[in-house]
Amino acid sequence: MPRRRIIGQRKILPDPKFSSELLAKFINILMINGKKSIAENIVYSALHQLSIKVKKKELDIFIAALDNVKPVVEVKSRRVGGSTYQVPVEVRPVRRNALAMRWIIDAARKRIDRSMSIRLTNELLDALENKGAAVRKREEVHKMADANKAFAHYRW
């Protein structure tokens, strides 16, 4: 136990355009080498293109796509005796958002398109329609947790 006070998690500043903390976190995860303005331009142009295609507000589209990718359960390794079990555990809300954002960005980076904004637009559109690599990743994680349901009593 630390003798000094426990330092809480730093509050993230909301993004300038939509004043959303979720979107600011997404921009921070997308950012490479501290180039935040480039990451902001990519995200904002992707959301603008998406709003033209879907004809809804940008932030509503983003949140809906994120909700379709969020995992409910995941597996964690737990060593019992001499063997390691994959124990299914429920995902905390903060980690849910972080995993969903990371999976969307990774899937967008693996796509083959001209620019990152187009790749991100297509991946968010796929996530909105419950298809695409990010949604496949969530289904894979859920399937893994379902297969290891027998070890749920090892939860800690």
Curated annotation (Swiss-Prot):
Organism: Buchnera aphidicola subsp. Cinara cedri (strain Cc)
Membership in a protein family: Belongs to the universal ribosomal protein uS7 family.
PROSITE patterns: RIBOSOMAL_S7
One Pfam match: Ribosomal_S7
NCBIfam families according to UniProt: rpsG_bact
UniProt name for this protein: Small ribosomal subunit protein uS7
Molecular function GO terms recorded: rRNA binding; structural constituent of ribosome; tRNA binding
Quaternary structure note: Part of the 30S ribosomal subunit. Contacts proteins S9 and S11.
Plastid found in the keyword field: no
Keywords: Ribonucleoprotein, Ribosomal protein, RNA-binding, rRNA-binding, tRNA-binding
BP-aspect Gene Ontology terms: translation
Function field: One of the primary rRNA binding proteins, it binds directly to 16S rRNA where it nucleates assembly of the head domain of the 30S subunit. Is located at the subunit interface close to the decoding center, probably blocks exit of the E-site tRNA.
GO cellular component assignments: small ribosomal subunit
